[in-house]
Amino acid sequence: TCTIGVINMLGLAKKNNAKILQASTSEVYGDPEIHPQKEDYNGNVNTLGYRSCYDEGKRCAETLFMDYKREHNLNIRIVRIFNTYGPNMTKNDGRVVSNFILQALKGEDITVYGDGSQTRSFQFIDDLVEGLLKMMNSDSVGPINLGNPIELSMKDLATMVIRLTNSSSNIIYKELPKDDPKRRRPDINLAKSILDWSPIIDLETGLKKTINYFTTH
């Protein structure tokens, strides 16, 4: 997807003189040593680690996009998407929000990896879609971060999900996977200044909408 698939899509865009967007990821920053992460930060990625195939694949895709712009003047856009959640997300995709909600609704123990102090930043899907539309309608190539700059620990997220689902679940802790980022938070000043974009849906409101979806589908 990140190499052959990207090359195929870039070739198609070139053939049809089409604008094309690379939905990149905050994973290109790896386990960052700088907080929050700005777009000019080159990241801290273990190229041989368990997670590196995805990280490096997305970095490769960004490189290919920039190469096609330089060589063929292709009309590209690159955004780096931070953790996103909301209705219609796949329930068993392994992401932390869906995992926590499903475990809480079933009354199962909520599994937190590490001591729960590691952080992420969560944006609601509606905010992301608005950011993507603004990016496609802008003149900016990017990369531009799209994410919520409010940081939350995994323990606090689990506690919030338990409260919002009125669950009897307990929180249990397991070993943190190797190379799992300790902190993740976007600097969105470029998105604010270039796209006039910032997320507007707070986490509790978004989680309520997502929990309602999970309970009715």
Where are these regions (language model features)?
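Short, hinge-like loop/turn segments at secondary-structure boundaries
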Residues: 38-40, 95-96, 190
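Short-chain dehydrogenase/reductase
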Residues: 50-59, 94-95, 121-122, 151
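C-terminal substrate-binding subdomain of Rossmann-fold SDR/epimerase-dehydratase oxidoreductases
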Residues: 83, 98, 102-217
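Short, solvent-exposed loop/turn segments at secondary-structure boundaries
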Residues: 88-93
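N-terminal Rossmann-like NAD(P)+-binding domain of SDR-like oxidoreductases, especially those catalyzing
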Residues: 1-84, 114, 126, 132, ...
